[in-house]
Amino acid sequence: MRATDADWLDAAARLAVRARPLSRPNPAVGAILVKDGVVIGRGWTQPGGRPHAEAVALKQAGDRATGATAYVTLEPCAHRSERGPPCCDLLVASGVPRAVIGVADPDPRTSGKGAQRLHKAGIETHILDHAASRASLAGYLTRTALDRPHVTLKLALSLDGCVATMSGHSRWITGEAARAHVHSRRALADAILVGGGTWRADQPRLDVRLPGLENRSPRRIVLTRGVAPEGVEAISAPERIAQLDGVQYLYIEGGPLTAAAFLQEDLVDRLEIYRAPIIIGGGVSAIGDLGQDALADAHGRWALVDCRQLGSDSYEAYSRTR
């Protein structure tokens, strides 16, 4: 079966994830060069934001780039930097006759200009508004559009929706496979947040403890009106996340009150639920009171985007729909 443009962009989006979170402050972008159905170059944004994905892929392809199609998750940049020329100029110089772009860049320095420059140079250019590309750029797009990080709320709970027994015992609800997966998700975040209660009760390390990924531990944030512990930043209210400079992806592991606080402020973009096959009965609910009176208001807010088995536990990811 012949791969479609969307298929190649799917592959580029998977490459883009490799850039997180080390590409900051630049977005994590993926690029693939395809010629006669064969990948001749691939790249993703490098640590510190340079080189860009297109530059990496073009360097790998070399002279073979002439006649290839370029697949890029984000519209190639059109502004010159002291660290290198615009990516659209690199593509024009490479001799690619066709470019397929996943998402238009909302940055006013590039928005529309990158695609326009390619088109003026005679390159057949398409912008698809591609779902996987958009998902891989969620942090950048959220920060640009809403001036805040993309927020993921993680919950580990029992079949009956509890995060702890009534006595407060919560270690461990899920098994080793689920906990390792949590560490892989932490490694993709710029910052991780817990509530003051969780910090005082557990003193969590909030780091990444997977071999080879120790350098990807995120910044640690505590939601508290008190003084931040040493080595930890503090914010006093959920809406203050907008002030976290350099943070495109925020991962929340707080307790019921913290979860409710962010949900009430409509600041959660993604829910990640790790569900263990246990029943606690009468335990601590995963989410505090949201003041929800009508069930109709609760429906239609979340769509399942991923699910898998992790040992004996299940993992479900939901994206906000409204």
Could you say what each language-model-derived stretch is?
Residues 2-26, 41-42, 60-61, 65, ...:
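Enzymes that bind and transform nitrogen-containing heteroaromatic metabolites
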Residues 79-81, 107-111, 133-137, 160-165, ...:
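Short, well-ordered, mixed-charge alpha-helical segments that flank or form enzyme active sites
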Residues 33-132, 261-263:
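Zn2+-dependent cytidine deaminase-like catalytic core
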Residues 21-22, 50, 115, 126-156:
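Proteins enriched for Cys/Gly/acidic motifs involved in redox and nucleic-acid/cofactor modification
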Residues 20-23, 52-55, 78-82, 145-146, ...:
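Short acidic/polar alpha-helix capping motifs at helix-coil junctions
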Residues 84, 107, 111, 144-148, ...:
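Short capping loops/turns at secondary-structure boundaries
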Residues 111-115, 137-141, 204-207, 283-286:
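Short secondary-structure transition/capping segments
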Residues 30:
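Helix-turn-helix
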